Amino acid sequence: MDLLLAARDGAKLAASLFEPATPNGHAVLLNSGTGIPRQFYGAFARHLADRGFIVLTYDYRGLGGSEKLRDATMEHWGRIDQPSMIDHLAALAPDGSRAVIGHSLGGQILGLADNIGSLDAAVLICSQSGHWRHWPAGRRRLRMLALWWLLIPGLTALTGHFPGAWVGTADLPSGVARSWARWGRSRYYVCDAQGAPLRPHNADVAFPLRWMSFTDDPIAPLGAVEALRPYYPNAAVERLHLAPDDLGTDAVGHFGFFRKSMPRRAWDEIADWLENRLRQTGRISSSKEISACPNHTSSPKSKTASAG
């Protein structure tokens, strides 16, 4: 079911709700990567729903079907959009166990949400620090330097937005692109406009956290992933750095885990882990209907799409 949900500040955010035929009492929010439309995660979300989870995916402001706000920044994504969706997830499963799955940026911003501590578990896929020094010396590091200092500032100034085709994503609003580049230039990565680190609620991430990265991912190399780990000092982290063979496939990269071609055993492993961890909370959900904006759109089944 496709919905249009209100953020805390009134911004309208497009979302998709995947409802299980046989609920297991658990609900999952999916935080997407930078510039990745929620439909890209549809097959994965539907698989989790088939396993009994309520799943909510959404587009950050300025992207996909969400309200096109030109002044949107990454701070808005983490401090308003994300906690708003956690609120909606709580409305779906007020007495149930709840988790977040973060892809790339979606795992970097957990500590920006003032209600992140209301969740019971998290899974991070390819989440890393984007600071350029964490890339191996040589051509790959030079590309990151060019992205943060030249490509994003230059193209954003020229076009009024960042053409996402340069990095394989959707176009980014100018404010989002500029804040992303600011983060990438800072050794703190997630930082405010003055360059100070933003870690307002990172200590509240004090639950089981499964963190996966892949040997063939050029966008989240091992050093960059490990650099993000200190952001969550109170989490019970389970780290997995896997080769594609470990998942029964030839390639994963930065986006492949969520593609329809991913062997279902990899998705089942995530579902099994979530079930085991969330069951330990001892909470059982009674599903409730989520409230949408008056001009919400809905369809009998959520659409799914593959990005490549």
Where in this protein do the model-derived segments appear?
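N-terminal cap/lid segment of alpha/beta-hydrolase-fold proteins
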Residues: 1-19
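Alpha/beta-hydrolase-fold enzymes
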Residues: 101-188
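Alpha/beta-hydrolase active-site loop
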Residues: 40, 72-92
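Conserved alpha/beta-hydrolase
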Residues: 38-69
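Short beta-strand/loop motif that positions the catalytic acidic residue
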Residues: 205, 211-213
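Active-site glycine-rich loops that stabilize anionic/oxyanionic intermediates
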Residues: 32-36
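Catalytic active-site module of serine/aspartate enzymes centered on a nucleophile-bearing elbow/loop
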Residues: 238-296, 301-308
